[in-house]
Amino acid sequence: MPSDDQMLLIRNYDLWCNLSDEDYKDLNIEHHFIEVPKGEYIYFEAYNHNKIYFVKEGYIRIGYIDAAGNEKVKEIIQKGELFGQFTLEKNNLHGEFAQAYKHDVSICAFRIEDFEKLLKKRPDLALRYSKQVGAKLRTIENRLLNLLNKDVKTRLTHFFWQLVEQKLGENQPEGFCIPNYLKHEDIANLIGSSRQTITTMINELETDGILSFNRQQICFLNVKKLQKLVSVN
């Protein structure tokens, strides 16, 4: 793909929308566009890693291997989001993996050193980036607090409410819908439960007319009712 087309693609996203041609070249992104087939790992057991990744298309599964040798998902990264060494610290991904999930994905990568130079040069970009990282860290903190203080049903309703707040998808005749990139097992891993428990509770939410859940999409049929469940807990 010509570099002009690559630059146009990345400039479609808020974080990068004001990049100059010179800024773009400083990141060396044109040398690091990557197409990753579904199921392949972008990195695995990343002990010496100095890259940040930006998702142009698709979903990335971030996880780790537990003591029993099982893969555990801790985050699903979507189009327009960053992953990797997003705190700009080297070697803080011990035991973490990143895997192309659901479909083939398109990402770009750049070195921490190049990005830090650009942040020093462009304080407006540094501010936007710090806000994005801050929001990401708050999400992680809230998830941890929920794990410590909430029961499974409350954690599940908070998880779905988080999806509503992200305002993904479009308003559909049957309600607000988002593309579904999650299996019951993924949700179980993300909120600290079992697949069987999550399946039972999703069935209850469907019976109550709050949402519908299938492989293609999640539809929130009664947002006010879901919000009430979240506010009560």
Where are each of the predicted segments found?
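Phosphate-/nucleic-acid-contacting segments
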Residues: 165-233
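Glycine- and acidic-residue-biased ligand/ion/polar-headgroup-sensing regions
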Residues: 39, 50-63, 79-80
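Polybasic "coupling" helices that flank or enter modular domains
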Residues: 124-190
